[in-house]
Amino acid sequence: DVTLPGLLQEHGVDLFHGTCFAVPLVGGRPDTAASGFRVDPGTGSHAGTDSLGIRVGDAITMPKQYVSLAGNRATGRSFDDRVGCAAQILALRRLDSRRLRHSVLFIFSTREEVGLEGARFAAQRLGGEPIRVHALDTFVSSDAPLEIKTFANALVGRGAVARAVDNSSVTPPALVDSLAALARARRIPLQIGTTNGGNDGSTFTRFGVPDVAIGWPLRYSHSPAEVIDLADLLALADLTRAIAEAW
């Protein structure tokens, strides 16, 4: 059997037939056989589907565009880790270099999902020189209707997240407390979370550098329809700036 990964649940697809496309819905459960999936173009009969020009063998692709949802919410693909990059850029734009207590290095690294390769190169170059490292990465949230709340229960729309524990590192509790105090002083909404997965900052721990990973809550991670709250992005940018200026 051919199985499809868990990212293919219910979401929109673009269905191409000639020069036109429809935006139907794919239905099914994750990790089920490909034959168990269907495309629903919204028609009520075979004849109605034929009238749209849809034929067996037509190709489908996942939507690639950014879509605004209700309130501050948005959906799209690859928010992990485009949101982290956006937060760093916003922090850099707002940073007051006169307030820096230390030299601060911003790194945009690549290939995290296939072995932390970009971050590992940076860690090898810098060694134990940094005081701390802060990976800006997705916090895969259980804030969705069908998710179990035991783990990763940081709510979308409630601010940035500090990772206390994940599979790659344990943040020293004193640093978690200090970060939370900084966020309170700057009136930045911050949640403390524990989760599975890992983060780029763990490549520095072998050199004795504490990894204090921060991020934002994300629904439906690694799918073409990830969901974020833009307020969380802004909170992460503010927290990144505060860390650079005052910690």
Indicate where each model-derived feature is located.
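N-terminal hydrophobic/helix-forming segments and targeting peptides
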Residues: 1-247
